[in-house]
Structures are given as structure tokens and as C-alpha cells.
Amino acid sequence: MVSVALAQPVSSLATMLAYYGEPGTSSWDEEAHAGPGRCPHCATALVQRQRAVVNSIAPRTQQTKKRNVAIFIHNGVEVLDFAGPSEVFAATQGFNVYTVSLTKEPIISQAFIRVLLNYSLTDCPPPDILVLPGGQTGPFLENEPLISWIKRCAQSAEVILSVCTGAGLLGKAGLLDGLQATTFHNYIEPLQKANPRARILRHTRFVDNGQIITTAGVWAGIDGALHVVAKLKGQAVATQTARYMEYDKWKPNEGLVVDMVGKPASKKD
């Protein structure tokens, strides 16, 4: 077995010459490293080259603060609903991704996988982006501490992204009123019935209302997360992340971006 050293990122350099990943191989290919080896994020080989842009190797104190991405998971959660968006944000620079649940006790997913938690509702860092995956969501719709926490997050979060039946939690928190939304195809009618003030759409990969973004089922969570990346960091970064993940199903135009009059677009980094 070959042992490969993972290079350490450079916090600041006096010259522009350093070691980088091959251009276009991942979203980390512009992070500078002091020596050869492999990228600690994506394991691509590092090559020595000169960069024309300085700010990516500026001291950490000068770099843009990472956005907190809280992935709420619960017993019976659909694995791909949370694993897909988690991978998107973790594979893109500028995001701090962590899991949160009602407590710190391990949960069992819909596919019988045991998942460990980073935080509970009581000690979770305030999220800039909150992801609400689906699965067996029904038992949690009446959980008052959870619904109250989602409402509090909505007061300060930049984006709340629901995947699949996770839209039910948004509805229970009153966050779908007056909006267009989508969800898992088998959940469209129940969600519409429970949220008469919302318009639940079929055959739509994701719906962006500004702060509130909903997606269809399972795989569509990846599309929704990539859309959030494009919205916050630009289309080129999202495309690069999709390429790194070898996710060739993403078609940005399959989603609906609602024109929210009077609501400014999110600022890109």
C-alpha cells in the first residue's frame, strides 16, 4: 500500500509560487500549499505553479468568514436527503457543515444506518443555512421544540433548504404561507392540504422563494444545494462542485426562481 502525505494549507506566502491542485479538478484547486503531496480535501495531486491572484493565500484573518450549514437529521431520515446536500456544501469552500438533531443521541436513518450527531437543538451554532431533509418526517411535525427552533432559525438564517418531505416542517412552522413550493411527488397532495395558503408544484426540481428553498425528493436535494451554492458564490463555483462530485444530472433551469418583488438577491462572495 502506498502512503500519501496530505499537504498543509499555507496561511500566507511571500511569493506567488506554491503548490496547487490541477485547475478544474475540484473546488479546492486554488488553495495554496507549502509543498508537494495531495490536497487534504479532495486528494488530488499538487503541482507547483504561479498564481496571478493573491487573496486566496491571504492570512486566515483576512479570508471571508465561513457560513454555518446546519443539517437537521432525525430518526427515519432518508440518507440521500441529507448526505447529498452535505457533500455539496462540504466539497465547496466557504461552508462549515455540521449535523444537528433533537438530542445528541445517535439516530437511525430510513435505510438503517446509524448516524452520530455534532449538536443538539440546545447547543447548535446559529446556522446561516439550515437544511431540512425528509424521510419519515410525520412524527416530528408535532414536535414543538423542533418547530420553535426552526422558527428561530428563520429569523436570522440566510437560506432554509428543505428536501423531499422536509417541506412539511417548513409548513408546520408557517414558513410556506403565501409561497410556491415543491416536495416529494407522493407528498404533494398531503402538503397542499396541510398548507392551503401555499401553492405546491409538481414536476419542479426546486423552488427558490428567496430565503425559503424547497426541492423535490431524494436526488433533488443535490440540485437544491448546488443552486444555493450558485446563488451565494456564483454559477462557476457550483458547476465546479458538481464536476468534482461527478454529478451530471444537475440542470439549473429545471428549478423555479420566484421573482420576489422588494426582496434583494443574496449577496455572492
Predicted features along the sequence, with ranges:
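Extended, subdomain-level signal for the structured scaffold at the beginning of enzyme domains
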Residues: V2-Y20, V47-I160, A167-K172, G178, ...
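Cys/His-coordinated zinc-binding microdomains
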Residues: T25-D29, A43
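Short functional micro-motifs and their immediate structural scaffolds
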Residues: A32, L46-V47
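Short metal-coordination and nucleic-acid-contact micro-motifs, chiefly zinc-binding Cys/His arrays
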Residues: G35
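The −1 position to Zn-ligating cysteines in a subset of zinc-ribbon hairpins
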Residues: R38
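Short beta-strand scaffold positions
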Residues: S162, T182-T183
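Class I SAM-dependent methyltransferase SAM-binding "motif I" and its flanking Rossmann-like core
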Residues: T183-H185, E189
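A short glycine-threonine-serine/GTX helix/turn-capping micro-motif
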Residues: G210-G217
